[in-house]
């Protein structure tokens, strides 16, 4: 077994002003997405400066949707007892699935403003999202969040405050799968023009498969436990409609046009 790295969650402290690693990871993800998005802006048919506007929409969607999603999916009883708890962002967490819904709403608003097809925009955004997912999982790891289940694998970590047993470093698994692998696959697939909706469908399907798999070694949320069959978690349940939507999008995309503003400009 390995000892959990002793990393101070506070990256920078200047008097009462503190910057946490978790917050910095969000910044890293957004800045990385902004930089790569500007490099591919011509594919979307917008000016590079518009990517900053897209980032603003996306950031609002992630933060608002992530918090609302966490409250509804993982803390509904507490929300019902104290509706103002949803504003206590330091107490609780963020939900990827809620953040995804928030980003989709933000994408719809941005697409309307810039007169873009909705799935044309989501295909552009999908390869950028793993940067934020991977950075966020590193933030979870530094904060000792999302511990794995007890195991005896050689790389098991002893989590602070959870007893002497070794546990799966589940945030690192998710970093590798949802961050690194998804980015490489989506970036490579999207390097050539694809039919509208195909990249979005592949994103949903990959995330659903990876998240469903990692949930088997990740400790269930204490306030929920297993929600069915003595093994199904809320995270797994929420990935099922994602997988179905991903498959449906990939099938639907076969009848859609190829999206690339550079090709359209040349015709």
From Swiss-Prot:
One Pfam family it belongs to: LGT
GO MF term list: phosphatidylglycerol-prolipoprotein diacylglyceryl transferase activity
Pathway: Protein modification; lipoprotein biosynthesis (diacylglyceryl transfer)
E.C. number: 2.5.1.145
Transferase found in the keyword field: yes
Domain of life: Bacteria
Gene Ontology CC terms, in alphabetical order: plasma membrane
Topology in the lipid bilayer: Multi-pass membrane protein
Compartments where located: Cell inner membrane
Keyword terms, alphabetized: Cell inner membrane, Cell membrane, Membrane, Transferase, Transmembrane, Transmembrane helix
Membrane-spanning residues: 10-30, 54-74, 90-110, 116-136, 169-189, 197-217, 231-251
EC class of the enzyme, as a word: transferase
Matches recorded under InterPro entries: Lgt
GO annotation terms (biological process): lipoprotein biosynthetic process
Binding site for a 1,2-diacyl-sn-glycero-3-phospho-(1'-sn-glycerol): 137
Function, as annotated: Catalyzes the transfer of the diacylglyceryl group from phosphatidylglycerol to the sulfhydryl group of the N-terminal cysteine of a prolipoprotein, the first step in the formation of mature lipoproteins.
Protein family: Belongs to the Lgt family.
Name of the protein in its database record: Phosphatidylglycerol--prolipoprotein diacylglyceryl transferase
Annotated source species: Chromohalobacter salexigens (strain ATCC BAA-138 / DSM 3043 / CIP 106854 / NCIMB 13768 / 1H11)
């Amino acid at each position: 077994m390995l000892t959990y790295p002793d990393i101070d969650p506070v990256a920078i402290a200047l008097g009462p002003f503190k910057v946490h690693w978790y917050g910095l990871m969000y910044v890293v993800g957004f800045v990385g997405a902004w930089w790569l998005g500007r490099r591919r802006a011509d594919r979307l048919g917008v000016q590079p400066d518009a990517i900053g506007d897209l980032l603003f929409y996306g950031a609002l969607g992630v933060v608002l949707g992530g918090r609302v999603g966490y409250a509804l999916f993982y803390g509904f009883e507490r929300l019902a007892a104290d509706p103002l708890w949803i504003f206590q962002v330091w107490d609780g967490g963020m939900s990827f699935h809620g953040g995804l819904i928030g980003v989709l709403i933000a994408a719809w608003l941005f697409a309307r403003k810039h007169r873009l097809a909705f799935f044309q925009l989501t295909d552009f955004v999908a390869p950028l999202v793993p940067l934020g997912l991977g950075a966020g999982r590193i933030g979870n790891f530094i904060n000792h969040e999302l511990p794995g289940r007890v195991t005896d694998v050689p790389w098991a970590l002893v989590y602070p405050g959870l007893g002497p047993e070794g546990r799966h470093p589940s945030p690192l698994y998710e970093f590798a799968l949802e961050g690194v692998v998804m980015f490489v696959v989506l970036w490579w697939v999207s390097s050539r023009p694809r039919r509208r909706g195909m990249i979005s469908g592949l994103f949903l399907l990959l995330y659903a498969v990876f998240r469903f798999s990692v949930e088997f070694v990740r400790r269930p949320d204490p306030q929920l436990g297993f929600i069915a069959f003595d093994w199904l978690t809320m995270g797994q349940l929420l990935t099922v409609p994602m997988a179905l939507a991903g498959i449906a999008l990939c099938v639907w995309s076969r009848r859609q046009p190829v999206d690339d503003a550079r090709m359209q400009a040349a015709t």
